A protein has these predicted regions:
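Conserved non-catalytic scaffold segment of RNase H-like nuclease domains
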Residues: 1-128, 143-157, 162-163, 167
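Phosphodiester-processing cores and adjacent nucleic acid-binding clamps
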Residues: 23, 97, 108-109, 113-232
Length: 232
């Protein structure tokens, strides 16, 4: 069974794409578990009318030890973060930078979800900003790409992407800002002019992208059993 929902925008709000102010951001973490892992770096770039108007970046001192595997991936060591602010200390700067602008992340279900869990952990409400997942948007806009990692999408738009600098929050946020600017151009070229339009877009190759979900089906009688075998 394939999940038909391809959510691009969370916390939907009407906003014109033509003069959109957005914040692209990225996190580096000690791992993938929102319950057990911590943020080690935050990076964000703010764009208005296609031009950068601000950026923010900081290493974050996690409570958890950074493993060698994560250091190999992000190039962030335990020594790098020993004098960095904790996430509790840095949260006010993140929220001040976001304001109420649209935020963009590549695989927002992870980055926004992780950040929301951290906010709740320290007594803050979850983000109410419209949050755009550029990964899901790429599925819809660029159905013929062979891969949808940020580097693949950047190279499609001829935006330089250095694999050695990848997996650093400030670098990925900067690349994502350029990618999303190009996506906005493509959206308007295709007749989409508002943030609210993105969720309504079709995903041509949905069956190739979304992982199948496990489902249990109960047949109550022989007729149901016969019909069930027609599904598989």
């Amino acid at each position: 069974m394939i999940d038909p929902a391809f959510t691009v925008v969370y916390n939907e709000r009407k906003a014109s794409l033509k003069d959109l102010t957005f914040v692209s951001f990225d996190l580096e973490t000690t791992g993938l578990s929102v319950m057990d892992d911590d943020i080690t770096e935050f990076g964000a770039v703010k764009i208005k009318n296609g031009q950068e108007i601000g950026r923010i970046q900081s290493l974050i001192k996690p409570k958890k030890h950074i493993s060698q595997k994560i250091t190999q991936l992000t190039h962030i060591t335990n020594d790098d973060v020993k004098d960095a602010p904790t996430i509790e200390e840095f949260i006010p700067q993140i929220l001040d930078f976001f304001q109420d602008d649209v935020i963009v992340a590549h695989n927002a279900t992870f980055d926004v979800g992780f950040l929301n869990e951290i906010l709740v952990r320290y007594g803050y409400p979850k983000l109410k900003n419209p949050a755009i997942d550029s990964l899901t948007l790429a599925w819809k806009l660029l159905p013929d790409l062979k891969g949808y990692r940020l580097g693949n999408v950047a190279r499609h738009y001829r935006i330089p992407y250095d694999g050695d600098d990848a997996h650093r929050a400030d670098y990925d946020a900067e690349v994502l800002a350029g990618v999303f600017n190009m996506m906005l151009h493509d959206l308007m070229q295709q007749g989409y002019y508002d943030v609210l339009d993105m969720n309504a877009m079709e995903c041509p190759n949905a069956y190739k992208i979304v992982r199948p979900k496990h489902m249990c089906v109960l047949a109550k009688n022989k007729t149901g059993l016969k019909n069930m075998f027609k599904l598989v």
